[in-house]
């Protein structure tokens, strides 16, 4: 089970999380949001990380030029798209950002929303399910209805997000079989962007105890 922790803003915390064994680190590249990091900060954090750390930028309907600038500043290996990006936009990124992993986030309000995934299968490498919120694109702390998603198995690797914490992750993984989990506010102590390393350690222990999932292309490009 792979673990991605999103929303780092501090170089030391990002470095420590990578050394703990977090498989992928996420950085919010959305101006005006609580965990936003600009290009200079992103470059500073990236410079503090161990070699081969997998880094993902989070975007909401961003221009390709903005994504390319962030990819270059942070030496990112992946982009996570949380807006209304179309399948055509996602496919276009394969040409404009070659070699960069594309993850499309889908905010789920009801099970019927999952039907949209079929439109993206040929345009992305992985899909992320997050809880729906009327104004926020992620990091809300809201959980999905896991039982309503039971049996969900798309035609590409998928990540579970939305309100995951050390006290509910095991329950979620008893019901669902994602390829990876993605956490942000669930490993904080109330201050956006300030991560609690003890909570991250707990999450890693829970994930390590969960076996039998198929392997997503989050860290080795396979």
Curated annotation (Swiss-Prot):
Annotated pathway: Amino-acid biosynthesis; L-tryptophan biosynthesis; L-tryptophan from chorismate: step 3/5
Enzyme class: isomerase
Pfam family, one: PRAI
Disulfides per UniProt: none
Protein family per UniProt: Belongs to the TrpF family.
Name of protein: N-(5'-phosphoribosyl)anthranilate isomerase
UniProt organism field: Gloeobacter violaceus (strain ATCC 29082 / PCC 7421)
EC number: 5.3.1.24
